[in-house]
């Protein structure tokens, strides 16, 4: 983005305050240019990496793909259990998807169920299952406990 500025007329020796303030404002605007973010896939530097570094980079980018997550559901307290207890779901799904699934499967009329990861904490509804799986898997399964009322406070 280029700024168009007019040259001052050399024949006029007087300059008023409005012209000075205009040039100062132009300078401030030019100094505050927003940097554009370029995705790594279009980076010229990444294309010129040595072969070994290219292989390492491709491994990292390929690992972030979508995969199936194994989930084991365990009820807490008097909440009924579902059969089967183990399901597979895409890693890009969120916890809210699991919540909706359990509400339908258990036929809960209040549309409210509390989910916990390994009886420890309640995840955010927008948390991705793939991220939770990588952090909290046990025996290659993500254990999700569910309950009708708040179990841990």
UniProtKB/Swiss-Prot annotation:
Gene Ontology cellular component list? Atg12-Atg5-Atg16 complex; autophagosome membrane; cytosol; phagophore assembly site membrane
Q: Where does the protein end up? A: Preautophagosomal structure membrane
Phosphoprotein as a keyword? Answer: no
Q: Where on this protein does the Glycyl lysine isopeptide (Gly-Lys) (interchain with K-147 in ATG5) crosslink form?
A: 153
Instruction: Identify the stretch(es) annotated as Disordered.
Output: 1-26
Classify the protein's membrane topology as the record does: Peripheral membrane protein
From the Swiss-Prot or TrEMBL record, give the protein name: Ubiquitin-like protein ATG12
